[in-house]
Amino acid sequence: MKKVQRQMKWLFLAASISAALPVSAAKMVQVDDPSLLEQALSMQARSIVPTQNGFQVVKSVTLPNGKVKVRYQQMYHGLPVFNTSVVATQTEKGIGQVYGMLAQQIDSDVVSTSPQVEQKQAVSIALTHYQQQNPSLTSADLVTENERAQLMVRLDENQMAQMVYLVDFFVATNEPARPFFFIDANSGDVLQTWEGLNHAEATGTGPGGNQKTGFYQYGTDFPGLVINKVGNTCSMMNSAVKTVDMKHATSGGSTFSYSCTDASNYNDYKAINGAYSPLNDAHYFGKVVFDMYKDWMNTTPLTFQLTMRVHYDSNYENAFWNGSSMTFGDGQNTFYPLVDINVSAHEVSHGFTEQNSGLVYQNMSGGINEAFSDIAGEAAEFYMKGSVDWVVGSDIFKSSGGLRYFDQPSKDGRSIDHASQYYNGLNVHYSSGVFNRAYYLLANKANWSVRKGFEVFTVANQLYWTANSTFDQGGCGVAKAAQDLGYNKADVVDAFNQVGVNASCGVVPPTENVLEKGKPVIGLQGTRSSEAFYTFTVASSTSAKVSISLGSGDADLYVKAGSKPTTSSWDCRPYKSGNNEQCTISATPGTTYHVMLKGYSNYSGVTLRLD
């Protein structure tokens, strides 16, 4: 053997990377350069890893095709760094492809991580600020729930690293809200605020239906409800979902239970505003959403039991996710009660986004956030019914048509069809049209479907999107997810291109020689340590063999998918003496495969071939 390589555990230091790429101040950088990873790993191999710095594992995701992806969160002295994430492919050989964003040279801006403002003070500052911005609210009116403050590091719009608290809480009033704040952890200044309550403007039917959809029965027309029964009392609760009757209040509520004295366990409480039983609707649809995520993605939409709160307030024409539960109004003139499969999946999926990518609910990231929930709503409709109408809210919208449209979002008179129509401050429900249409175009391509489209968007949410992802970054994440799943990445890039989003991840078409199947390249020569690069792609999934033969001297063959191989980063490297080497790989369309010939010694007369 020419050399023995040591497999190293994947966990590298932010400090190591900073040393590898010297800069003068904090800044965000993209991690996809194999040479950067090579430097970081090399330095890591010689270091003792401090647990408070570097990257911590957030989750490990096993894709339906068996590939294992690991997502890491950057840490600085034990604090998470906002809007950073690195994803790596775990293979039998160790770590494969890497992609993500990290912050460099934080220590040039943040010297100490001991905050001058305590956690409770940060919450109090946020509450005071919220009340000042909403003077009509008295202290007695300001009823809050789920108060949270997390200490972290972020880079502001000027690339200045700051230690901050991310504070949020739910305001339980007739006009519910969930404000978010960045509070300076030293000065107590309010640096940024945004409204994070994930409202649903479009909804659908519930168990029993409504006057528009018609009446149907669970247990006859659809499977029965999964409930809990003790004696003659039934409760709407199971391992995935509990359903709460709010009784037209804006806070409180308890799990709905009813008398059930026979085997039918029949519940018809209660008909309202043209719907036959919104409580049944919510309970059934919540379970369907959990089942879809489990069956299709081998995951759960939430890390905790879902709470579905029904009959919220009086004549409330909306639905929202407050960070821990889903809440439905009964509608009035515009809507029937807002419980249906689309809305249930939509709002629960805001929770999924919050627990995965953490997309901020404003700007482009907010549009992606809202679109993912719309996409999940259509996916759940397909999972339940076997078909979709590509319209958001048609079943519970009392007028004709719907609230949002996938095929042409601008049909609603407000949403945009193309990224070129986006402007700062555009409502996230309207900017969602860009990703909604991209999903529609992708799902309707040959060899694609509602399910496959949902899979790539979901993996992007799990692994590649970050808090402030732009449209291009979000599209790149979906393309990378398609590649991970073995789907046609080029189809994803094309779908996003049609809506003005560059999903190519900034990849420049290769300028190296392109190999063609069955057409050998002959007479190759090089000196010791020289490197020559070639690329190839395939039109359909196939077994591809790359080989070198003949000639004198010693050339080594390297092959890697997605980026140039190096001596420490490759998918195949026979590493034999002489020039008779070959690599056989399972190639998929939409991926560029890179080939390197490296001179172990001077070589000449070598033939390179793709079969």
Swiss-Prot record:
Cofactor(s) this protein cannot do without: Ca(2+); Zn(2+)
E.C. numbers: 3.4.24.-
GO biological process, one term: proteolysis
UniProt keyword Calcium, yes or no: yes
Keyword Secreted: yes
Residues annotated to bind Zn(2+): 346, 350, 370
GO molecular function, one term: metalloendopeptidase activity
Propeptide span(s): 26-199
Keywords linked to the UniProt accession: Calcium, Hydrolase, Metal-binding, Metalloprotease, Protease, Secreted, Signal, Virulence, Zinc, Zymogen
Cofactor binding mode and count: Binds 1 Ca(2+) ion per subunit. Binds 1 zinc ion per subunit.
Cellular component terms per the entry's GO annotation: extracellular region
N-terminal signal peptide: 1-25
Subcellular location: Secreted
Annotated active site: 347, 429
Entries under InterPro entries matching the protein: FTP_domain, Peptidase_C_arc/bac, Peptidase_M4, Peptidase_M4/M1_CTD_sf, Peptidase_M4_C_domain, Peptidase_M4_domain, Zinc_Metalloprotease_M4
Processing after translation: Seems to be more extensively processed.
UniProt function note: Extracellular zinc metalloprotease involved in the virulence mechanism of V.anguillarum.
Family: Belongs to the peptidase M4 family.
Protein name: Virulence metalloprotease
